[in-house]
Amino acid sequence: MNPATLSTQTSQGMAATPNGTGSEEALRQLEAIEPPEDLLDPQMSENALKVLERRYLKKDPETGKVVETPRQLFWRVASNIARPELSYPDGSADRALAVAREFYDLMARRRFMPNSPTLMNAGREMGMLSACFVLPVEDSIEGIFDSIKATALIQKAGGGTGFSFSRLRPQGDIVRSSGGTTEGPLSFIQVFSKATDAIQQGAFRRGANMGILRGDHPDVIQFITFTADLGRLQNYNISVTGTNKFIDELRSEPSKAHTVLNPRTKEWVPLEKRDAEGNATGEHWTVGEVWDLVVQHAWRTGEPGVVFIDRVNERNPIKNVGLIEATNPCGEQPLHPYDSCNLGSVNLGILVKPGPGGEPVFDWDEYKQIIHTTTRFLDNVIEANRYPLPQIDNMSKTTRRIGLGVMGFADALFK
């Protein structure tokens, strides 16, 4: 199934031809800007309306004036995310319309909300609907700047990006092609950061990134302490990987010298301590000292986080696709290189209702139905999406990653 092969052009920019017959009226309603009249108006607070106006509703490109209502926004999203139903084996316009009505109802009644790129871009020219991406960073100038270009395309459309810089050779290592030495991962992280600074995501928000370095990379100490200056990397979360080897040594031999692996030479060596001028002191970092440094800086600045990368790969259900090296900016989605994920959240607070005796009860039956419908919504996003690169299109449709979470947990407990 490939939405690019579908042929009936809609007023909202997505194409589809139903496999089944369906009705012309159902197709007309799917293509309409206004939702069917019998659908309820969105239940929105004053604050929510302000956020919609500021970030999500369509604006006139010349005047900046809002030209879309919340009702039209939710139908734009619902109808476009339902259109992949037309290309399924049992697809028909009537079925797609029924699914679109379900999607609209979930959003209008505040049961569910998809990630920002879906709200911003569904049915619009940009068409990029995913929130999370991971890009590879190869140890070459070409590979590094290919990733920067891909980052620009993703963040322009409202997505966030994660990277592992662990393949880059360490500071001071030789560059055979030029005869010089490299500045190491930290200098290139700053190049990525500057590129992100120059891009305002979808004209709605600044870019977000995750930068990861293996705990056994030779530049790990500089990486851990890099955000001690709070003015650095304002658009980055950073994390070090904690391997099984490191954790085992931390438990059993914390005073053992911490060994690191040069990604170019594949040579393991003890990690030397250096003075303020960068000169070797003749001493080595121990495993316990490296861990203490991580804890100290995480307490002071909130960075770095720790990604247990071996555990991630052990639990990866699609190991045949390859190793996972990085996560999305918030860290909840480990992804393969060129992979993406679209996200959404179920509102738990609104599912607490008065019981038979007036006591608050959680509506588990509605919760189950919402999960079923929203999983379908997120999977449809994979097909409706316009990916910024063919590699991302291929990987995303191979892995079919979705992330369904919850919001309103505190509200549910309060009720």
Question: What is each residue range found by the language model?
Answer:
Residues 1-415:
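Extended catalytic cores of very large enzyme megasubunits
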